[in-house]
From Swiss-Prot:
Cofactor requirements of the protein: Mg(2+)
Enzyme class, UniProt record, top EC level: transferase
Record's protein name: Bifunctional protein GlmU
Cofactor binding, note field: Binds 1 Mg(2+) ion per subunit.
Catalytic activities: alpha-D-glucosamine 1-phosphate + acetyl-CoA = N-acetyl-alpha-D-glucosamine 1-phosphate + CoA + H(+); N-acetyl-alpha-D-glucosamine 1-phosphate + UTP + H(+) = UDP-N-acetyl-alpha-D-glucosamine + diphosphate
Active site per UniProt: 353
Species in which this protein is naturally found: Granulibacter bethesdensis (strain ATCC BAA-1260 / CGDNIH1)
Family membership: In the N-terminal section; belongs to the N-acetylglucosamine-1-phosphate uridyltransferase family. In the C-terminal section; belongs to the transferase hexapeptide repeat family.
Region (Pyrophosphorylase): 1-236
Length: 451
């Protein structure tokens, strides 16, 4: 998950391995498409790579068209047989451009741009032919240990030892392999082509490029990065843990940028949520993907926003829902149990209670009464409603689209509006009230007499 500025100019290639089945997820969805903070793991990693690498290639498995669509416009290559990580990386080398190439895993979505930049810069120092990421997990037991040796020019990696094969001294090492490697493209292609599958699973492992790099007379440098960035996500438990980690980071970033949250631990943000300074967010608010909120807006408790823009000094909620395509002008009000979808509210417009506004444009300062509904769907097509500036929509009005309410027009409460209403007109579309004296008392007597 990237939290850093862009690095310029990007160069080289990032190869993302995304062909794994992810069986521990117990899901029909490909592992890299599971979301964290409203964004797939794959898109998190692509976003981190883009400021550093000019070219990105994603390796997918057979029948993974959904992953290819998620990767677009970046090219994909199919690993027809899942023969290991080195084999997967080798499939991509025909698409790799000159310069550095980094091999990454699609289930490591929290790597930051800063860490990737550090990895590339370490490789470019010239004393190491291969740079790799390493970490110190709180529970290192299942990870391969990074064994280093001292040389005249510094400490370099001598080998990776899997935990099952490590002796007591090696198991005591806390520096562990994160599985991310960076080298020049020509060397990487040669090493990948030289990896053998002489192991119990008969697979070609990416980590086996290390002895090949050393055998060629080169050094391998380890770049240590935070475990929270490099942890793999292989199960729903780990997915939930990653979500919690990311939410903490996003909340802190928002608070540091001047957002007020009365109960930040209950607020859920998306990776692309943009909240301006002096926005006030109440408890239990959810921001889905694609939300921007301008300064001074207040989002009250239990509101849900996605794909919308909220203008300055607006008031949202509590219990409001803003769906994709909704745009609120400055000073607009959207109150409790109001739902907006593809709706534009002009400056100062208000819809304060129990309302559905879909496929509608509401003018400035218009007032939408409680219980108003835009009837936008005829069973086949969606239709739009237009409400002019300063219009007043009476409570419990049904606006049957397509329909236009003119500037300054008023609709009577309980009306079903099927025709356009001219500017400054009063529209009444309901039966005339009839009062029948004593009829209620007569009805009660009849009912009681039937008991």
């Amino acid at each position: 998950m990237d939290q850093t500025p862009s690095y310029s100019p990007p160069s080289g290639t990032a190869v993302i391995l995304a062909a794994g089945l992810g069986t521990r997820m117990k899901s029909t969805r490909p592992k890299v498409l599971h979301p964290i903070a409203g964004r797939s793991m794959l898109r998190h990693l692509i976003a981190a790579c883009q400021p550093v690498f000019s070219h990105i290639v994603v390796v997918i498995g057979p029948d993974m068209d959904s992953v290819a669509r998620e990767a677009a416009p970046h090219p994909t290559v199919v690993q027809q047989e899942r023969l290991g990580t080195a084999h997967a990386a080798l499939q991509a080398m025909a698409l790799v451009q000159q310069g550095e190439v980094a091999i990454l895993y699609g289930d490591n979505p929290l790597i930051s741009t800063a860490t990737l930049h550090t990895l590339v810069q370490r490789r470019r120092q010239g004393d190491a032919v291969l740079a790799m990421l390493a970490m110190r997990p709180p529970e290192p037991g299942r990870y391969g240990r990074v064994i280093t040796e001292k040389y005249q020019t510094g400490d370099y990696v001598s080998r990776i030892v899997e935990y099952a094969e490590a002796n007591e001294q090696e198991r005591a090492v806390t520096l562990c392999n994160a599985g991310v490697f960076c080298a020049d493209a020509a060397s990487m292609a040669a090493w990948l082509g030289g990896v053998e599958n002489a192991n119990s699973k008969g697979e070609y492992y990416l980590g086996d490029i290390i002895p090949l790099a050393i055998a060629g007379g080169g050094h391998v440098a380890a770049v240590e990065a935070p475990y929270e960035e490099l942890r793999g996500i292989n199960s729903k438990v780990e997915l939930a843990e990653a979500e919690a980690t990311v939410q903490i980071v996003l909340r802190r970033k928002a608070l540091e940028n001047g957002v007020t949250m009365t109960a930040p631990e209950t607020v859920f943000l998306s990776a692309d949520t943009l909240l301006a300074p002096d926005v006030l967010v109440g408890p239990h608010v959810v921001f889905g993907p694609g939300v921007t909120v301008e300064e001074g807006a207040e989002i009250r408790a239990f509101s849900h926003l996605e794909g919308c823009h909220v203008g300055r000094h607006t008031l949202i909620g509590p219990y409001a829902r803003l769906r994709p395509g909704s745009v609120l002008g400055a000073g607009a009000h959207v109150g409790n149990f109001v739902e907006l979808k593809q709706a534009t509210l002009g400056e100062g417009a208000k819809a304060n209670h129990l309302t559905y506004l879909g496929d509608v444009e509401v003018g400035a300062r218009a007032n939408i009464g409680a219980g108003t509904i835009t009837c936008n769907y005829d069973g086949v097509h969606k239709h739009r409603t237009e409400i002019g500036d300063d219009a007043f929509i009476g409570s419990d009005t049904a606006l049957v689209a397509p329909v236009r309410i003119g500037r300054g027009a008023i609709t009577g409460a309980g009306s079903v509006i099927v025709d356009d209403v001219p500017a400054d007109a009063l529209a009444l579309a309901r039966g005339r009230q009839v009062n029948k004296p004593e009829r209620a008392a007569e009805i009660r007597r009849q009912l009681k007499g039937s008991v």
